[in-house]
Amino acid sequence: MIKIRITLESKEDVIREILVNPENNLEYLHQSIIKNLKLDEFEMASFYITDSNLDLGEEIPLFDTSEKDGDVITMKNMPISSVLYSKDSKLIYIYDFMNMWRFFVEYLESSEEITEKCTRKLGEIPEKAPDLKFEVECQEEVESYEDMLEDSFDDNEYEY
């Protein structure tokens, strides 16, 4: 078993620590999160692999919604152990894309326990999703859309 901490990104502390079998897939972890946080099981969700700064990487969705089947690795095809295996491994879990609940999921430790369970429960899920600010840092400002287009194309670059 491994111990995993799930933390809601919010002003209030909402934390669950659970023991799970690392050989189960991410869909199983998704269901465990739903159960332990008492969330609606009918909402869409995705895990995102992150780096040490929690920058978003590859999305691992619940379902493949791409035009070609098999183009996307889904939760069902990804073992927990392949993404949560050391103290440095973290995921971001986005639940309910309309309200954008965001959770940090991190590996805590390996455990000799043999039963999956919740080992720590702190706080309750608020009724409304926290307001998250997604800030983008711009290196330089673009004066206008026309300037941006003018800079992007060179008439002499193409043959007619």
PLM segments and residue spans:
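Short linear regulatory motifs enriched in tryptophan with gly/pro/ser
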Residues: M1-Y160
